[in-house]
Design a protein with these regions (language model features):
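Secreted/extracellular ectodomain signature
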Residues: 1-180
Length: 180
């Protein structure tokens, strides 16, 4: 993740010759930052709600939104390999899964690239003041900065959009085979 080169060619490769890290949580309770997994392995991909705006019909010029009051993190409901169609493809998967399971707002994949770190998703007062919750509305961290470091994380579980707990040791659901 982050600005390392372990991003499965910026999330466009499922080759076993690449190694990558979809920012899943490892056993030390931190986002994996090294090359732990082959890009052809199915892992959980985390998504973050970055806006309360709703998707709107084409006749409306702008989405309706209210100020963001908290940050919510969920996971895709099915494991994914490293070929997510790039960041845009991964973002589209997050948005589609959120809509499928009636999660409001706009969602994007919590993935870094070679040039952009996930830390930069929220900056300034948002990064220091908005609390971070999982999709079951359980407090995970007092703010984005703490969430990125896990130094004061309250709740250790991520959940997929459909409600399944995501395993922290591997970043995958205990049984993706029964996912919707």
């Amino acid at each position: 993740g982050g600005t390392t080169s372990s991003t499965c060619n910026d999330w466009t490769s499922s080759s076993n010759s690449y190694t990558g890290c979809a920012n899943e949580v490892d056993s030390t309770q931190t986002f994996c930052q090294e090359t732990f997994h082959k890009c052809n392995e199915n892992l959980a991909v985390l998504c973050v709600q970055y806006s309360t705006a709703q998707t709107v019909p084409p006749t409306t010029t702008a989405p309706i939104s209210s100020p963001l009051t908290k940050i919510v993190v969920s996971a895709l409901s099915n494991g994914q390999n490293g070929n997510l169609g790039g960041i845009k493809g991964a973002d589209a998967k997050c948005q589609a899964d959120a809509q499928k399971y009636n999660k409001p707002g706009l969602w994007r994949a919590l993935l870094g690239t070679k040039s952009k770190s996930v830390q930069s998703f929220f900056t300034g007062s948002q990064a220091s003041s908005l609390k971070v919750y999982n999709s079951k509305n359980e407090l995970m961290a007092d703010n984005w900065n703490a969430f990125m470091k896990f130094n004061t994380r309250k709740q250790t579980y991520f959940y997929a959009f459909q409600g399944r707990k995501v395993d922290e040791g591997t970043g995958a659901s205990p049984d993706w085979a029964d996912a919707d």
